[in-house]
From Swiss-Prot:
The modification Phenylalanine amide is found at F8. Its main location: secreted. Keywords: Amidation, Neuropeptide, Secreted. GO terms for biological process: neuropeptide signaling pathway. This is FMRFamide-like neuropeptide FLP1. GO terms for cellular component: extracellular region. Belongs to the FARP (FMRFamide related peptide) family. It is found in: Secreted.
Length: 8
């Protein structure tokens, strides 16, 4: 989901 950005 939009939480994919947390992978940074």
């Amino acid at each position: 989901g939009d939480r994919n950005f947390l992978r940074f």
